UniProtKB/Swiss-Prot annotation:
It is a multi-pass membrane protein. One of its GO terms (molecular function) is CDP-diacylglycerol-serine O-phosphatidyltransferase activity. It comes from Oryza sativa subsp. japonica. The keyword Transferase applies. Its EC number is 2.7.8.8. The chain crosses the membrane at residues 103-123, 142-162, 168-188, 260-280, 287-307, 359-379, 384-404. Residues 1-51 are annotated as: Disordered. Belongs to the CDP-alcohol phosphatidyltransferase class-I family. Pathway: Phospholipid metabolism; phosphatidylethanolamine biosynthesis; phosphatidylethanolamine from CDP-diacylglycerol: step 1/2. Keywords: Endoplasmic reticulum, Lipid biosynthesis, Lipid metabolism, Membrane, Phospholipid biosynthesis, Phospholipid metabolism, Transferase, Transmembrane, Transmembrane helix. InterPro entries: PSS. Catalyzes a base-exchange reaction in which the polar head group of phosphatidylethanolamine (PE) or phosphatidylcholine (PC) is replaced by L-serine. It is found in: Endoplasmic reticulum membrane. This is CDP-diacylglycerol--serine O-phosphatidyltransferase 3.
């Protein structure tokens, strides 16, 4: 459906539609002052935001409304709308949510200081007094991390992502630094000490895991089993890694948004499993488990679902107007929920075969991706972390959040250098 916008008579310097009905590009950044001056007196001067983007005008109907067509990216509005201010300048955000984008350093400082005083227990020393010296140390370490994350949320460098809020991605940046510091600390510990240290993060850790090999019996049909002759297939299908494969590749497809690159990573990781099966028992899989179940079923379904999600939202037409301009309560609710979705769903163009340098750059991305995935299994094996431990899920979610701005910025960097 086309987007309908009210049309006002253009100024003498504005571009006119061609007589043959062709497309004419007009620049809103240049047409903003003239369009504001020529608004009818019955309409308020500040009733609509000024969007800094280019419009493609196809036709003007009899009612005086512009019919806009074009790609979904041209239709998409950014969250940072340019609103006229009463002082003659411009404001970058919707008036209802502008306070969220203003600095609140002093307010957070005062609130954080009060929270730290309350959490430290200095107001009630008789309650917090304990002979156990480990508990205060744990609370102190968590308080240090909280203070650092609060600082990163306020002062860390912003990414190119604006949804749901730039502060969210600054917080993710701080969590990535905390994770890096924790890995650095474990690097300087002995292996047994590092395993026992994990008990401070989860009480169920620090215990040696039983070795499990998926390739000990690769028969698809087991005739000597009276209860279930397809017991090997059943145990593999109901393993937790099946769901992990599907959800993981769906998330990777939403991040990378390039089918060729996703299939390279899918096949490449299976080759990595084949390479390191002598080191990790979990990598010792049967041929039908690795080729059929992993690549052709789980990975394919995750990639298909992720790319279908990207195509679905990329093909829809949006009008990202501010929250205050939504006409109904449901519209305001939907606009608030859309704030937690990406601002752009267009597919990334990597062009790995454009030139040798671009091929090396994309190859480095694949190597980094597979290294992060291999680290998951090596850390579980070295630190005795079972697959169903919540720390594994927390780490994967953290890495997914870290990879979202990292891949987007890396793709933007490659596109800017090529242009």
């Amino acid at each position: 459906m086309p987007v309908r916008r009210r049309w006002y008579p253009p100024s003498s310097t504005a571009a006119q539609p061609s007589p043959d009905g062709g497309d004419v590009n007009t620049d809103d950044a240049d047409a903003c002052p003239s369009s504001r001056q020529q608004r009818p007196p019955s309409l308020p001067q500040h009733s609509a935001p000024i969007h800094h983007r280019r419009r493609v005008i196809n036709s003007i109907d009899a009612s005086g409304e512009v019919m806009e067509y074009g790609s979904s990216n041209d239709q998409r509005m950014q969250d940072m709308e340019i609103w006229p201010s009463d002082g003659g300048g411009v404001e970058e955000y919707d008036p209802w949510t502008a306070w969220l984008y203003k600095p609140h350093t002093v307010s957070v400082l005062l609130a954080g200081a009060c929270l730290l005083i309350w959490a430290s227990g200095v107001l009630h020393p008789e309650i917090t007094s304990s002979h156990d010296k480990v508990i205060p140390i744990k609370r102190g370490v968590w308080a240090m991390i909280a203070v650092f994350l609060a600082y990163c949320t306020l002062q860390a460098p912003s990414t190119i992502l604006i949804r749901p809020h730039p502060a969210v991605w600054r917080l993710v940046h701080g969590m990535a630094v905390v994770y890096l510091v924790a890995l650095t600390f474990l690097l300087f510990q002995k292996r047994d000490d590092a395993r026992q240290f994990m008990k401070h993060l989860h009480p169920g850790l620090g215990v040696e895991l039983p070795e499990r090999s998926y390739g000990s019996d690769c028969r698809m049909y087991v005739p000597e089993n009276p209860t279930n002759r397809f017991i090997n297939i059943q145990e593999t299908l109901f393993d937790e890694f099946v769901i992990a494969h599907v959800l993981g590749w769906w998330g990777k497809a939403v991040m990378i948004r390039n089918q060729l690159l996703l299939w390279v990573l899918s096949v490449g990781f299976e080759l990595m499993e084949l390479t390191f099966r002598h080191m990790l028992p979990n990598f010792n899989e049967c041929w039908w488990d690795s080729i059929i179940l992993d690549i052709m079923i789980c990975n394919w379904f995750g990639i298909w679902a992720g790319m279908h999600t990207v195509r679905y939202f990329d093909g829809k037409t949006y009008e990202w107007v501010g929250l205050s301009r939504q006409p109904s309560i449901m519209g305001k609710v939907k606009r608030s929920l859309c704030q937690f979705t990406p601002a752009k769903w267009d597919k990334d163009q990597w062009h790995p075969f454009m030139e040798p340098r671009r091929f090396i750059q994309v190859f480095c991305l694949c190597v980094g991706f597979m290294t992060v995935e291999l680290n998951t299994f090596f850390l579980k094996f070295c630190l005795w972390i079972p697959p169903r431990n919540p720390l594994v899920v927390y780490r994967l979610i953290l890495w997914w959040l870290i990879a979202i701005p990292a891949i987007r910025e890396y793709n933007t960097y490659l596109q800017d250098r090529s242009s």
